[in-house]
Structure formats: C-alpha cells, structure tokens
Regions:
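Catalytic phosphate/metal-binding cores of nucleic-acid and nucleotide-processing enzymes, i.e., regions
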Residues: 1-141
C-alpha cells in the first residue's frame, strides 16, 4: 500500500493534523531505546504511535511477526502501566490491502501478534484505522 514507513508516516501525520492534532515525529537516533515514532496530542488527549510497513500483511493474514526493535514493546507496555492503564501507545501497521492497529496493553511473545487478539484491530482502510484509533483513545478517558 505504501512504499515505505516514511510514506505511511507522511499520510498519517497529514490526516491527524487536518483533524486538529499536533504530531511530533521522533528521530529514533536521538532518543532512548524503544521510544515510538510519533507523539500525537490534541482534542484533550495524547498518545504514542509506532509505525510499521508490512507489504505481506493482507486481509487474509491471521498471524503476523511484527518487526519491533529491541526495547519497543517493553517501552510501550511500561508507559501504559505507569499511566494507570489510561494512556496508550499503539503500533500501526500498513499492509498490502489493510491496516492493523495494535494496542500495546501487553507484550507479545516473540513479536508474534494473532490478529484475532482483543488488543488487535484489522481495518480495511486508513479511515477505519483512524476511527478505531480514536475509539480506543477515547475509551481510556
């Protein structure tokens, strides 16, 4: 769907900004290990997004090995727990013909995500991904 994670990032950032959110792209080389790609704030909330681009991901996919770098899952889960389970980090994955939103409420063994997990949402479009994201963020309030 997107040629690269950077291309996905640009489209997602633009859509979030058009909805009134402030988006800060994090340069990973300048931060500690595990910090996600984007910090998003606005409309009375804030959350982190880790972005992935996985061309092999399709609507038919049931299990996915996510290419999290060392420290990314622990950082996200620790952030969630330290904020009393009301602040979120999500991994958003752009696939070939779908998107996946992973709410980082737990650590996934061996980076394997079952797409029927209660923390995982498969979406057919970027619009559906964003609607699901905002629904999850608002559930935390």
């Amino acid at each position: 769907m997107y040629k690269s994670e950077n291309a996905f990032s640009k489209v997602l950032s633009l859509k979030l900004k058009l909805l009134g959110y402030s988006v800060t792209r994090i340069e990973t080389g300048l931060t500690c290990q595990g910090v996600p790609d984007m910090f998003v704030q606005g409309n009375g909330t804030d959350f982190w997004l880790e972005l992935k681009n996985e061309k092999k991901l399709t609507l038919e996919t049931t299990k996915l090995k996510v290419h999290w770098r060392p420290g990314q899952q622990p950082w996200a889960y620790t952030y969630y727990m330290q904020h009393h389970k009301n602040k979120y980090t999500f991994t958003t994955i752009a696939g070939d013909n779908c998107f996946v939103l992973v709410s980082m409420k737990k650590v996934f063994t061996d980076n394997v995500v079952m797409l029927n997990d209660e923390c995982v949402f498969k979406c057919k479009s970027l619009t559906e991904l964003m609607e699901t994201l905002f629904k999850e963020v608002n559930n935390a309030k």
